Amino acid sequence: MENSKIHFSYPLDKSDFKLIEPYTYICESSGKGFRNALIKSFDYWLKVGDEKVQDISKVIQGLHGASLLIDDIEDNSKLRRGKPVAHSIYGIPQTINSANFVYFLIMDQCNKLGDPKATTIFIEELIRLHRGQGYDIFWRDTNTSPSEQEYMNMVNEKTGGLFRLGLRLLQAFSDNNTNYIDLVEDLGMYYQIRDDLINLVSVDYQQNKSFCEDISEGKFSFPIIHAINADSNDNRLLRILKQKTEDRSVKEHALEYIKSKGSLEYTEKKLNVLKEKIIKQINDLGGNPILMKLMESLENSSI
């Protein structure tokens, strides 16, 4: 069924919309819109204007929605924003095809933004995003704990990908050539590490996803990596991650172990260091009240 909120520049037949129903379904449960708000905040500096901001926001929103369809399959997730994941309704084959279909529809939109660099930027960041996702999956599926630095490098590739893409597309249409990459990558790092913490401690997250979902997925998140590295002679957390358990009592034991190693406090300290670094960069770049307000709202949400 065609959704009035779903628009692509490529001319789709009315019947084509049944092919992207998994994508339409996931778009019905919109997130907090942080990435779109981030693009708008950078336009405070870049002065591109509302029309181009909206066009680029549609690219980021479309790419993000399609990537979530694939992520949920790769992570064997059950819920997304409190609703059944798309592939549990439409099946894995159609969901994969729908996501890939949307990737190319979004690439077509990039091609029509009006700057030849836009498509190149899109491809470069999609390569980096998939590289990061690949490492994340490799570590999980081989039960191999990365170092903290390896994890942060992966986050720069994966989570930083959509953040950088939005900034780079916006800057392609701006006369402002100031380098904001370090700032946007630090924002991506803050966003991901904070999400890692929320996954383990947030009541809201547990209601919309599940209790300690990263443990059930066998995922190596920032606090989990710290807890593993805190005692190389104790392999219990690695063993639990390898099981990809749904057993709440086992996950509660894992969480208590993570707490006992001071990993949640360590993660909070890392977030505070990142926050101060981000604020300093914003001020050094001339200030940005919209971005500062966005940081404040991010800091105070979902925990």
Curated annotation (Swiss-Prot):
GO terms for cellular component: cytoplasm. The keyword Transport does not apply. Pathway: Isoprenoid biosynthesis; farnesyl diphosphate biosynthesis; farnesyl diphosphate from geranyl diphosphate and isopentenyl diphosphate: step 1/1; Isoprenoid biosynthesis; geranyl diphosphate biosynthesis; geranyl diphosphate from dimethylallyl diphosphate and isopentenyl diphosphate: step 1/1; Isoprenoid biosynthesis; geranylgeranyl diphosphate biosynthesis; geranylgeranyl diphosphate from farnesyl diphosphate and isopentenyl diphosphate: step 1/1. The keyword Transferase applies. Isopentenyl diphosphate binds at residues 32, 35, 64, 81. One of its GO terms (molecular function) is dimethylallyltranstransferase activity. Keywords: Cytoplasm, Isoprene biosynthesis, Magnesium, Metal-binding, Transferase. It comes from the Eukaryota. Pfam families: polyprenyl_synt. It is an enzyme of class 2 (transferase). This is Geranylgeranyl pyrophosphate synthase. It comes from Dictyostelium discoideum.
